[in-house]
C-alpha cells in the first residue's frame, strides 16, 4: 500500500500524535491486565495445577486463532475504509471484554474460549490498524521523537503498573480492579476521537503481488532471513505465559507476580539503556553469544525447581527479551526501504504476523494438551524448549549481523 494522506497542519499533527501516544500507553496497561493478570486469575478460579495449565492453553489458543483470523480479515479492509474506525472497534471490543470480566470474572473458567476469542479479535483489529495509523499520522520528521517518547512511557509503565495492579488485586478482588481498567478503556476510547484520519486515495493491499516482487528482488535473502528468524521468535511467545504460570504455581500471589514483573522491568530498562549506548549494529556478536546462554537458566526450573530458580529464570529471560525484541523489530522493516518495497509494508507485516500466528498457536495447543495429560514433566520440557528458542533467535541475529551488517550500516 502507499500512504497518500499527510496531515496538513502542524497543530493537527501534534494533536493526533499526542492522542495516539496516550491511547497506546493506555493499551499497555489494559494488555497487562488481560494477559499477565488474567492468566494469574485463571489460577484462582481453577481447581488443580493440570486444569490451570489446560485452561491457560485454551485461553491463549482461542486468542491467537482469533488474532490471526481478525488480522487477515481486517488488513485489506483497513486499506478500503477510514482505518481509525477499525482502531476504535479494537478499543471498544477490548472494553467489552473488561466489562465482561467485571460481571463474570469468578466464572471465567467456564467461559474461557469466549474471553480468549474476544481478546483475540480485539488484538487482531488493533494490529491491523495501529501500525498503519502511526505511519500515516506521525510525520517523518516527528517519527524518531514519537518512538523515543513512546518507548520511555512504555518502559515506565512496565515498572510501575505490574506492582500496582498486583497489589490492588490482592487487597480487593480481580473483578474490582477490572472496574478501574474499564474506566481506563472508556478514557482511551474518548481520547481516540482526537486522532484524525481518513482513507488514502489509491491505497491497495495485494499480498500475492508482494510475494512475486520479493522473488526477484536483490534483497530477498535478507528479508527471507528475517522471516526464518521469526519462525523461532514466534515460538518464544509462549515463554511470557509460562513465566506467569511458574510464578503463580510457586507463589500464588498477584502481588508477588506484580513485584517480580516490576523488578525485572526495571533491570531490563537499565540493560536496554546500556545496550543502546555502548553497542552498534554489526558489532554485537559477543553480546548475542552471551545472551544466547541466558535461556539455559530454564534448566534450573526443570531440574532444580525452587523459588530461587524461578526468580533467576525470570531475570535471565527478562534481560534476553529486552535486548532481543527491539533489535529484531529494527530488522523487521528496515530491509524494505533498501529493497524498494516500503510501499508493500502492510503485506510484509502480514507475512510476519502469519508466521508468528502459526508458531504461537502450535505452542499453546501443546500447552493445552500437556494440561489435559496432567504430566507436569512435559510442562517443564515445553518450558525448556521454548526458552531455548530465544537462543535460536539470537544465533540467527548473530548470523544476520555477520553476514549482512559487518561492513554495512543498513539493516
What are these regions (language model features)?
Residues 36-46, 74-76, 159-178, 249, ...:
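Transmembrane alpha-helix termini and helix-breaking/packing motifs in multi-pass membrane transporters
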Residues 3-65, 220-262:
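Helix-loop boundary and gating motifs at the non-cytosolic
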Residues 21-31, 35, 60-71, 93, ...:
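Substrate-agnostic recognition of the 12-TM MFS/MFS-like secondary transporter fold
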Residues 70-83, 169, 270-283:
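Helix-to-loop junctions at the C-terminal end of transmembrane segments
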Residues 176-194, 380-397:
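Symmetry-related core transmembrane helices of the 12-TM Major Facilitator Superfamily/SLC fold
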Residues 287-325:
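C-terminal transmembrane helical hairpin of 12-TM major facilitator-type secondary transporters
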Residues 92-107, 293-306:
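C-terminal ends and interior cores of transmembrane alpha-helices
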Residues 79-91, 279-294:
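Cytoplasmic membrane-interface "Motif A"-like loop-to-helix N-cap segments
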Amino acid at each position: 500500500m502507499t500512504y497518500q494522506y499527510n496531515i496538513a497542519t502542524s497543530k493537527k499533527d501534534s494533536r493526533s500524535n499526542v492522542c495516539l501516544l496516550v491511547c497506546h500507553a493506555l493499551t499497555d496497561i489494559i494488555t497487562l491486565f488481560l494477559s499477565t493478570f488474567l492468566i494469574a486469575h485463571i489460577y484462582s478460579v481453577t481447581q488443580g495445577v493440570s486444569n490451570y495449565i489446560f485452561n491457560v492453553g485454551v485461553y491463549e489458543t482461542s486468542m491467537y486463532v482469533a488474532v490471526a483470523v481478525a488480522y487477515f480479515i481486517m488488513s485489506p479492509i483497513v486499506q478500503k475504509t477510514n482505518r481509525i474506525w477499525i482502531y476504535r472497534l479494537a478499543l471498544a471490543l477490548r472494553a467489552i471484554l473488561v466489562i465482561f470480566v467485571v460481571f463474570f470474572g469468578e466464572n471465567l473458567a467456564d467461559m474461557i474460549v469466549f474471553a480468549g476469542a474476544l481478546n483475540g479479535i480485539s488484538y487482531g483489529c488493533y494490529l491491523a490498524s495501529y501500525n498503519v495509523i502511526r505511519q500515516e499520522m506521525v510525520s517523518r520528521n516527528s517519527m524518531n521523537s514519537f518512538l523515543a517518547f513512546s518507548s520511555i512511557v512504555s518502559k515506565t509503565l512496565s515498572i510501575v503498573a505490574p506492582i500496582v495492579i498486583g497489589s490492588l488485586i490482592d487487597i480487593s478482588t480481580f473483578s474490582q480492579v477490572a472496574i478501574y481498567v474499564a474506566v481506563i478503556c472508556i478514557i482511551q476510547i474518548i481520547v481516540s476521537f482526537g486522532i484524525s484520519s481518513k482513507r488514502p486515495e489509491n491505497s491497495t493491499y495485494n499480498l500475492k503481488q508482494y510475494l512475486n516482487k520479493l522473488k526477484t528482488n536483490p534483497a530477498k535473502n535478507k528479508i527471507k532471513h528475517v522471516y526464518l528468524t521469526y519462525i523461532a521468535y514466534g515460538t518464544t511467545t509462549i515463554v511470557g505465559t509460562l513465566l506467569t504460570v511458574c510464578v503463580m504455581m510457586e507463589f500464588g500471589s498477584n502481588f508477588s507476580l506484580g513485584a517480580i514483573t516490576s523488578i525485572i522491568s526495571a533491570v531490563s530498562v537499565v540493560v536496554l539503556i546500556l545496550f543502546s549506548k555502548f553497542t552498534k549494529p554489526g558489532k554485537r556478536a559477543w553480546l548475542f553469544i552471551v545472551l544466547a546462554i541466558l535461556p539455559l537458566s530454564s534448566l534450573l526450573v526443570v531440574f532444580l525447581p525452587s523459588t530461587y530458580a524461578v526468580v533467576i529464570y525470570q531475570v535471565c529471560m527478562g534481560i534476553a527479551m529486552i535486548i532481543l525484541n527491539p533489535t529484531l523489530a529494527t530488522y523487521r522493516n528496515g530491509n524494505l526501504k533498501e529493497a524498494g518495497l516500503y510501499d508493500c509494508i502492510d503485506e510484509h507485516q502480514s507475512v510476519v504476523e502469519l508466521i508468528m500466528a502459526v508458531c504461537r498457536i502450535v505452542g499453546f495447543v501443546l500447552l493445552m494438551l500437556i494440561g489435559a495429560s496432567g504430566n507436569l514433566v512435559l510442562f517443564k520440557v515445553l518450558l525448556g524448549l521454548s526458552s531455548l528458542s530465544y537462543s535460536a533467535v539470537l544465533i540467527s541475529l548473530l548470523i544476520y549481523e555477520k553476514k549482512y551488517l559487518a561492513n554495512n550500516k543498513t539493516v
